[in-house]
Swiss-Prot record:
Chain intervals with Low complexity compositional bias: 609-619
Protein name (Swiss-Prot/TrEMBL): Immunoglobulin A1 protease
The species this protein was found in: Streptococcus pneumoniae
A GO MF label: zinc ion binding
Short sequence motif named LPXTG sorting signal, residue ranges: 96-100
GO biological process: proteolysis
Length: 1927
């Protein structure tokens, strides 16, 4: 340890004879002392001389002076060091060895060198004799004699040239010895000026007259330690003025020594109980025998009078090295306080300990360890302790009661019982042999003269006022009780001027050793405040400068010489460092029980020991007063095992190969060894303890059985006291519960024995207590006719964790006030949570259920069937699943599957449910409350909320009841009835209220929410379409009205139930443990996680070592995970030695890593050191042999077949159900391949077996064998779906084997896996993985849901990444995330974790995303087989093999082709919604941030496929995309031969492919279906009577080709002028640059209609003027409206357009252009005669005029006229003000107010008519639509004079010899049109040809196309008008 400048140190004594180079057992001790140094004042310059000497030049006496170390610091004003070198044996050049740290070691002996030299040095002193410095060497042999040798100054010759002189400042470090070729440095001999004489005095009158002398131990101990051995403890007592040889007592006692650094300056700490104990334990107790009549003093002796002689041994040494961490004590600084009474001390600032890491070399002789040496160290310095010393002169007041003073409880003269006293540290002495500041001394009780009386911590007896030792009887090692006698009146201790006698302190002796009352407190006694017996705690840790084994022995001290003190003066204390021991805290009782010590706050006593020293010239006096609370034991606490936070105890026995749990005993078993205890904790894992004994006793007049489990080092806290072993009691059998049940197993047993009894719950029960076989249908068999009540004394109780229905059948029974929590039930037949069936007037009231039910047939949240039975004030909350395909009839309901009978009812109840079903027949029903309600059964005052997703279109499905019809009688009078019910359920393929509508339904006051999505996916006209269902909607309420309506219907709220008795959180209470600090409560809780099985005292001890600036002090620790580099370690036994990292995971999911180093095993726990923190860590598992378990279970596990009946029974499914959708078969095989390795991990992470015990291991073997199928299923499931990583950490092992990662320390991984495997087929379906985590894993992990768990893993292991970044780095799917080109949108899309985020992970984990189950399949993709495209409104998924064919083969360019195409597709989708974002208002823009699912078809090609793949793959396809992604997601897409279809929330590509260009156009079509009502149409919805296809094809979707001659808007494809077909383009070149806002859109359409209207006008003029009647008949047709009754809603106000050929009379009327409008004329060129049905796929032709302005006079227009007028309104008024009002229900409320209404599914709705729209849009400007149309034409006619010149390709010239033609005015254009019209008229019936193509067969069409294209190009996509005076 470093010696700081100016520090005075004189050391001349030795501690234990076991310390040395050679063990005392071989009769020799080798000691090497550091030469004492002279006093050096601060900053004084000193001369230092290095003289280099060869060892051959030394005499034998000089060799004995050799110090095997490197000189460290300047100490005196003139120093000479002889640096000794040894000639290398082969004369090779070598580096000087690093003999140790100059900062830490004071003595070093190299084993091999000493063995050769045989040097023996015990102590060195310097004394001036006739102005000559003489070194005195005391050589000590094992027999106790010494030899004194004087050594004079050395001379050197061989290495004279290397001599060097230095001028250095006091306290500076000395230079290192030089490297000398051919020589090796071995040590030094120091020559100095000071003497080693010293004295100790408490108070002095003058330099010549001593008053009282205090005997202090000043000793030096080398840095070696022996193993525990029996040695001779030599102790010496020297009387005053006597040279009498020391008395020696031989004590035989096994012990291990502790190493005290001889050069440290130790200081006493009273920072806290913990700091004090650590500080004081730097030395262990010693034993000393003193003659009762011989007085002890301190005197200056002549060394020749102390000669000891002996013979030395020189054994051969071998060594090895180990690493040890120790604590460093802190220094103490004394400050004068003039306001504090003289002689009084007070702690101003508490000290803090440092730490040291040492590499220790262990020497052995004949394979037995004899000593240890410290090779290297690293040190963290401690912080000092500051003590105030009073200087105020005060008058001592004796016998004054109730005085508020510094020192309380003990006063001078008080009788104090002795107690165990820790040893004093070594003293630092001056150059005159006088002690400096005394470290580690407790304050002593002083007399009224300020002199010490009782000195509790001194190794020798207290001396009398004459300076002579009191006579003290010899004291043996303390083993008994000590009770404290507290003084009544505390007094303040002061010091007066002048010499005074010290009052003698009478001391009451201990019971074992009588002591004269006049004697002072002696070694082995202390002031003790504990009431209980105590014994020293084991010291199991190492201290700085020492190595201690567990049973620390005592160290004897040799007294030092002293000489009379001189005048006293004050001197500041010098800096120094000291070492703190690791252990501190509690003491232990006789049986090893840890006893908490009093805390600081409970002690009012200060004891002061004062030590005065002065130097030889009398100029400086050092006075030390250290403070210690004598009520506190400061020994290290004994480290033991303790099972804390025990929540439950289970006793098991093995009999005839069967294990049985006992909740009571009949008698004392004869074979307790066949029993074991499972100790369950609320915080830690289960621990198995072997039973040692079972005995009978009585308590409270009851016969009880005491079960005792014994384990090494295990103690149990009972009533705040610790006792060995672990005990608890069981009742005598016969006291079974009869009415009030607190055990589920007892309840089940009792009811099964008496099915008609009355039963009350007395607590919440856990169904896990009862294990069911796979054949059991329920817990209680038979028919229950009694009563079960779940409430007692106003408390509501629940049954948790049902895995099957509670009852099989109920008949006339009553069940009330009962809650069923966390049910997870699956079955092959009809199932319900409470019972399968209730009959005969069963009453169910206030029964509340939450959980999940899955079955193959009927399912009810409470009951599968209620026949003539009632349910009232009850509820269900959870999920119900039946997705099996079967032809059997079944009924599914949120509360009841089938409610039947006149007396059957549901009243004042509710269901909050998510139902997944696959009904495909009319006798399969699904309802939010009940599936089938028949035979006069009724539901009233009830409601349902949630979602019903029925895959197929058929079946009876609805939000309240699936069907009310009585199928048995077929009589409407006996149908079920609904009264005052509400549906707040989203329904797919069903209705809102009932699933089947018929005349005469018995329904009244039914309500539904407008906000609900209620729709059916149907096939219409060979197209799959999604249609909203208005059938059976009842009264539709706004979302804002729903909550109040529910409250009006009923106010049912499930009660708050009592938690499980074992689920209550029980935290350890550390507050009563010694050294507890309230501000460290969190730290103790954290350390408890690091040391889960250690006793509280040990936890407090290490908790007090945690620095306040550390994270461990500031944050709550959730878990600690061992790692080997970056890999998580689970198999602790196999990796015990190789673990090198510890990850600490905190509650905020931050983490930090520490280096981890294995130290040793303690009580079958592997113990590790954590970095340089001084803390320990033990894994949450005991070490035991697992091979026997693995070897016995492995064969049976390997025999399990995945497709076996046993596996199906475990899954709970019928033989015909395929296992395909589990997607586990391949993984099941892989799991079995490495079972042995997995079982090691599993057993290492499961329950703790504290010892190898066949009964306990057999229990585990039996459990695994009985559940082998479930275990393998659970393991396979987690290995399949959690095999992904965070950086280098694979999460699979964390999920499987570290369920405590999030702080749930009491989870059993084995039980979790078994429970998962037994959770049922539905729960293990791959598609249910999100729910499976929530149901089967979250509660075991201490988490809530899958996605927060994944995020928290990421925060721990990849804190610098986002969730999405991690996800993309982990998945093998090819992900394209395309942000908008609009800056404000792009910014929002970068907001991680928001609804705006473009990140795939953020979107698929959104609560609104239907397929959140995609995450795990994407994370575990084994290969790149799937692509994902994310844009603002959609999220697309497809397979690479969808594009695989001969052209793009898997081993060719398939991957690059797909990935390039994916990027192009993403850009198109981005551009499309950038277009929409620009033209919508803010409300509409916000709604674009959504997730519409896009799916490519399940059509996968091969390398031999021609063109597009057409074969549809099913879920058992081996294709990797299907097997690893689409199948596990479970979206059963219905395939057809069409291009694509939409369902409202998804788009499915069929014939078209997502990544093709036609797929882009399809995208605009299908996304219109998903967007029109709520977004494009401003939220007003589609106009009544207009079908979904009206809005897509021909209106809002993009044109199929850029050459399409249709009135449409290209919103998605970018074209280029360099395209080969640019000359044919008629659509916008680039929508991203053309449309910047809605104004741009209107301008484009308006300017386009300038051309359209002009050309139509010219063509119309030509027809009416140039053609005869018959030619007009051929060129034109007429359009009319037809009103048919709508088959869905029964209304006849929706127009259907019919195109007819003209009659001759009609043709004759066409004499002017206006007559074309007035007679509803349109061109025959591209509009064939026929009916244009509503909701059709029609487009408005760009060059075939519709002159008509036909409106829907009764209501809604037809599909042709509606599209044409919509575009004309867009041109005239814009999108928001023109098109949207026309095609939406924007004016519905206006219509309603005007009395224009229709009835939609029984509800009155406003009917928006064309007349109303015209009036509203144009504010009454036009009276008719014909007037509007005429005005539009006239607007262009008025501009004809301003027509711009245009040059176009002459269509009359044949290709490729096209010429150009230029027109300058309309007249020229009219002439060309006349010619073209006449040319077409000359062709015979060309419009009627089947193969007619206007592009090639019509001159008019070709002319109009050429003109349009020319103006399109000339105006740059109609950015400008074709008229001069318009923009």
């Amino acid at each position: 340890m470093e010696k700081y400048f100016g520090e005075k140190q004189e050391r001349f004594s030795f501690r234990k004879l076991s310390v040395g180079l050679v063990s005392a057992t071989i009769s020799s001790l080798f000691f090497m002392s550091v030469l004492a140094s002279s006093s050096v004042d601060a900053q004084e310059t000193a001369g230092v001389h290095y003289k280099y000497v060869a060892d051959s030049e030394l005499s034998s006496e000089e060799k004995k002076q050799l110090v095997y170390d490197i000189p460290t610091y300047v100490e005196n004003d003139d120093e000479t060091y002889y640096l000794v070198y040894k000639l290398n044996s082969q004369n090779q050049l070598a580096e000087l060895p690093n003999t140790g740290s100059k900062n830490e070691r004071q003595a070093l002996v190299a084993g091999a060198s000493l063995a050769a030299l045989g040097i023996l040095i015990f102590a060195v002193s310097k004394k001036k004799v006739k102005n000559k410095t003489v070194l005195h060497l005391v050589l000590v042999a094992g027999i106790g004699n010494g030899v004194l040798v004087s050594v004079h100054a050395l001379e050197n010759h061989l290495l004279l040239n290397y001599n060097t002189d230095y001028e250095l400042t006091s306290g500076e470090k000395l230079p290192l010895p030089k490297e000398i070729s051919g020589y090796t440095y071995i040590g030094y001999i120091k020559e100095g000026k000071t003497t080693s004489d010293f004295e100790v005095s408490n108070q002095e009158k003058s330099a010549a007259t001593p008053t009282k002398q205090q005997k202090v131990d000043y000793n030096v101990t080398p840095n070696f330690v022996d193993h525990p051995s029996t040695v001779q403890a030599i102790q010496e007592q020297t009387p005053v003025s006597s040279t009498k040889p020391t008395e020696v007592q031989v004590v035989e006692k096994p012990f291990s020594t502790e190493l005290i650094n001889p050069r440290k300056e130790e200081k006493q700490s009273s920072d806290s109980q913990e700091q004090l104990a650590e500080h004081k334990n730097l030395e262990t107790k010693k034993e000393e025998k003193i003659s009762p009549k011989e007085k002890t003093g301190v005197n200056t002796l002549n060394p020749q009078d102390e000669v000891l002689s002996g013979q030395l041994n020189k054994p051969e040494l071998l060594y090895r090295e180990e690493t040890i961490e120790t604590k460093i004590d802190f220094q103490e600084e004394i400050q004068e306080n003039p306001d504090l009474a003289e002689g009084t001390v007070r702690v101003k600032q508490e000290g803090k300990l440092g730490k040291k890491v040492e590499i220790v070399r262990i020497f052995s002789v004949n394979k037995e360890e004899v000593s240890r040496e410290i090779v290297s160290t690293s040190t963290t310095a401690p912080s000092p302790r500051i003590v105030e010393k009073g200087t105020k002169k005060t008058q001592v007041i004796k016998e004054q009661p109730e005085t508020g003073v510094e020192h309380k409880d003990v006063q001078s003269g008080a009788i104090v019982e002795p107690a165990i006293q820790p040893e004093l540290p070594e003293a630092v002495v001056s150059d005159k042999g006088e002690p400096e500041v005394q470290p580690t001394l407790p304050e002593a009780v002083v007399t009224d003269k300020g002199e010490p009386a009782v000195q509790p911590e001194l190794p020798e007896a207290v001396v009398s006022d004459k300076g002579e030792p009191e006579q003290v009887a010899p004291l043996p090692e303390y083993k008994g009780n000590i009770e404290q006698v507290k003084p009544e009146t505390p007094v303040e201790k002061t010091k007066e001027q002048g010499p005074e006698k010290t009052e003698e302190v009478p001391v009451k002796p201990t019971e074992e050793t009588p002591v004269n009352p006049n004697e002072g407190t002696t070694e082995g006694t202390s002031i003790q405040g504990a009431e209980n017996p105590v014994q020293p705690a084991e010291d199991t840790q190492t201290n700085s400068g020492k190595i201690a084994n567990e049973n620390t022995g005592e160290v004897s001290n040799k007294p030092s010489d002293s000489k009379p003190p001189v005048e006293e003066s004050n001197q500041p204390e010098k800096n120094g460092t000291a070492t703190k021991p690791e252990n501190s805290g509690n003491t232990t009782s006789e049986n090893g029980q840890t006893e908490p010590e009093p805390s600081n706050g409970n002690s009012t006593e200060d004891v002061s020991t004062k030590s005065n020293t002065s130097n030889s010239n009398g100029n400086e006096e050092i006075k030390q007063e250290n403070e210690l609370d004598p009520d506190k034991k400061v020994e290290d606490p004994e480290k033991t095992l303790e099972l804390r936070n025990v929540s439950d105890l289970e006793l098991y026995s093995l009999s005839n190969g069967t294990y049985k749990q006992h909740i009571s005993l009949e008698q004392v078993p004869s074979n307790p060894n066949s029993y074991f205890v499972k100790v369950k904790s609320s915080s830690f894992k289960d621990v198995y303890l072997p039973v040692a004994s079972i005995s009978e006793g009585r308590k409270n007049d009851k016969i009880l059985y005491k079960i005792t489990a014994k384990v090494e080092k295990l103690q149990q806290e009972i009533e705040s006291r610790y006792k060995d072993n672990f005990t608890f009691y069981l009742a005598k059998k016969g006291t079974e519960e009869t009415t009030n049940f607190t055990s589920f197993s007892n309840l089940v047993k009792a009811i099964n024995q008496n099915l008609s009894g009355t039963y009350h719950l007395g607590a919440s029960l856990n169904a896990n207590e009862v294990e069911l076989s796979t054949d059991d249908k329920s817990y209680i068999k038979g028919t229950f006719t009694g009563q079960l009540i779940g409430e007692k004394d106003g408390k509501h109780y629940a049954i948790y964790n049902l895995k099957k229905p509670l009852f099989e059948n109920l008949s006339g029974a009553t069940v009330e006030k009962l809650s069923l929590k966390n049910v997870a039930i699956s079955g092959k037949n009809d199932i319900g949570s409470l019972a399968n069936e209730a009959t005969n007037g069963t009453k169910i009231k206030q029964v509340h259920v939450d959980g999940v039910l899955a079955g193959e047939r009927g399912v009810g949240g409470l009951l599968a069937k209620a026949d003539q039975s009632s349910i009232a004030e009850s509820s269900f909350k959870g999920r119900i699943v039946n997705t099996y395909e079967t032809t059997d009839s079944y009924n599914i309901g949120g509360l009841v599957g089938h409610l039947t009978g006149k007396n059957a009812s549901i009243a004042k109840s509710k269901a909050t449910v998510t139902i997944s079903s696959n009904t495909n027949r009319s006798d399969q029903t699904v309802g939010g409350l009940a599936g089938l309600v028949d035979r006069d059964a009724q539901i009233q005052d009830s409601y349902a909320e949630g979602d019903i997703n029925n895959v197929k279109h058929f079946g009876r499905v609805a939000g309240v009841a699936g069907n009310l019809w009585d199928r048995t009688s077929g009589d409407v009078r006996h149908a079920g009835s609904l009264t005052n019910v509400l549906s707040d359920v989203n329904v797919t393929n069903g209705n809102a209220i009932t699933g089947y509508h018929y005349t005469g339904m018995k329904v009244a006051n039914t309500f539904s929410s407008k906000a609900n999505r209620v729709f059916n996916v149907t096939l219409e006209k060979n197209e799959v379409v999604s249609k909203e269902s208005f059938e059976e909607r009842g009264t539709m309420l706004d979302a804002s009205q729903i909550a109040s309506k529910k409250a009006e219907i009923n106010l049912i709220t499930p009660p708050i139930v009592e938690p499980l008795s074992t689920s209550g959180k029980k935290d350890s209470d550390f507050s009563k443990i010694a050294h507890y600090q309230a501000n460290r409560a969190l730290v103790y809780k954290n350390i408890e996680k690091l040391l889960p099985f250690y006793n509280k005292a040990t936890i407090v001890k290490y908790g007090n070592l945690v620095k306040e600036n550390s994270i461990l002090y500031q944050k709550e620790l959730l878990s600690a995970v061992m790692m080997k580099d970056d890999q998580v370690i689970t198999d602790i036994i196999s990796n015990k030695q190789t673990a090198n990292k510890l990850l600490l995971h905190y509650k905020d999911h931050s983490s930090e890593k520490f280096d981890l180093r294995y130290q040793a095993d303690f009580a079958n726990l592997a113990e590790y050191s954590i970095g340089d923190s001084g803390l320990l860590y033990t894994p949450n598992q005991f070490l035991y042999h697992q091979d026997s378990i693995i070897n016995q279970v492995l064969p049976e596990l390997n025999r399990v077949n995945y497709q076996s009946d046993a596996v199906r029974n475990t899954l709970g499914i019928s033989p015909e159900v395929k296992l395909t959708e589990l997607y586990l078969e391949e993984q099941f095989t892989k799991t079995k391949e490495h079972l042995a390795e997995n079982l090691k991990k599993l057993l290492s992470s499961d329950a703790g077996l504290v010892t190898d015990n066949e009964v306990m291991t057999g229990y585990i073997i039996d459990k695994i064998k009985r559940n082998k199928e479930a275990l393998l299923l659970g393991m396979s499931y987690l290995e399949r779906w959690y095999n992904f990583s965070y950086g280098q950490v694979n999460v699979k092992d964390l999920v499987m084997y570290h369920p405590d990662f999030f702080g749930k320390g009491n989870t059993s991984p084995l039980d979790t896996l078994i429970e998962l495997g037994k959770s049922g087929f539905n729960n293990l379906l791959a598609k249910n993985n999100v729910d499976t985590y929530a149901i089967s894993l979250a509660s075991h992990h201490g988490t809530t849901d899958l996605f927060s768990t994944l995020e928290n893993y990421r925060k721990v292991f990849l804190p610098d990444k986002t969730n999405n970044d991690w996800f993309k780095s982990q998945t093998k799917a090819y992900i394209v995330e395309e942000k908008s080109n609009i800056e404000e949108v792009k910014t929002k899309q970068g907001l991680v974790g928001t609804k705006y985020s473009i990140g795939v992970y953020d979107r698929i984990t959104s609560a609104t995303w239907k397929y959140r189950n995609m995450v795990l399949p994407l994370l575990t993709l084994p290969e790149r087989s799937v692509f994902v495209i994310s844009t603002i409104s959609s999220l697309g998924f497809g397979a690479y093999d969808r594009y695989r064919n001969k052209e793009h083969q898997a081993n060719g360019d398939l991957n690059s082709f797909v990935e390039k195409s994916a990027h192009e597709t993403a850009e198109r989708q981005r551009d499309h919604y950038d277009y929409w974002y620009r033209i919508l208002d803010e409300k509409g823009r916000e709604k674009l941030y959504r997730n519409i699912l896009l799916y490519d078809a399940y059509k996968f090609g091969t390398n031999h496929t021609e063109g597009k793949a057409t074969e549809v793959a099913d879920f058992d396809s081996p294709n990797p995309a299907m097997k690893h992604f689409f199948g596990p997601v479970g979206n059963k897409v219905g395939h057809n031969g069409h291009g694509a279809y939409a369902t409202g929330d998804a788009v499915y590509y069929m014939g078209y492919r997502m990544l093709d260009k036609d797929g882009a156009i399809t995208y605009t079509h299908e996304m219109t279906h998903n967007s029109d009502q709520d977004i494009y149409l401003g939220g007003y919805g589609r106009r009544s009577g207009l079908g979904p296809e009206f809005f897509a094809k021909g209106l809002l979707q993009a044109p199929d080709q850029p050459s399409d001659a249709t009135i449409t808007i290209n919103s998605i494809l970018k074209h280029s002028k360099s395209d080969s077909k640019e000359g044919e383009r008629l659509q916008v070149l680039d929508p991203t640059t053309r449309f910047k806002d809605a104004t741009d859109l209107q301008k484009y359409v308006h300017n386009m209609f300038d051309v359209v209207y002009m050309l139509e006008y010219l063509e119309g003029k030509s027809i009416v003027k140039k053609l005869n009647v018959y030619q007009k008949i051929e060129a034109l047709r007429k359009i009319e409206n037809q009103y048919l009754t709508d088959p869905a809603d029964g209304n006849d106000v929706y127009a259907t357009n019919v195109v007819k050929n003209l009659t001759e009379d009609e043709a004759k009327k066409l004499t002017s252009f206006d007559s074309l409008i007035d007679n509803n004329i349109l061109s025959a060129r591209e509009y064939k005669a026929g009916t244009y049905e509503r909701n059709g796929y029609f487009t408005i032709k760009l060059f075939a005029p519709i002159f008509s302005a036909l409106s829907g006079e009764k209501g809604t227009p037809g599909d042709l006229m509606g599209r044409r007028i919509a575009f004309e309104l867009l041109a005239a008024k814009g999108f928001k003000d023109g098109m949207v009002p026309y095609i939406s229900n924007q004016y519905e409320e206006d219509a309603k107010q005007q009395g224009q209404t229709i009835n939609l599914y029984g509800k009155e709705r406003g009917l928006v008519t064309d007349e109303l729209v015209l009036k509203k849009v144009f504010d009454g400007k036009y009276k008719t639509w014909a007037e509007f149309k005429t005005a539009m034409y006239q607007e262009r006619v008025d501009q004809f004079g301003n027509l711009k010149q245009v040059t176009f390709k002459d269509p009359t010239k044949p290709w490729p010899r096209y010429g150009t033609k230029t027109i300058n005015n309309v007249d020229e254009l009219q002439k060309l049109m006349d010619e073209a019209v006449l040319q077409d008229a000359k062709e015979r019936n060309y419009y009627y040809w089947n193969n007619y193509n206007p592009e090639t067969d019509s001159a008019v069409h070709k002319l109009k196309r050429a003109i349009f294209k020319a103006y399109l190009d000339q105006t740059n996509d109609f950015r400008r008008s074709i008229f001069e005076n318009k923009k």
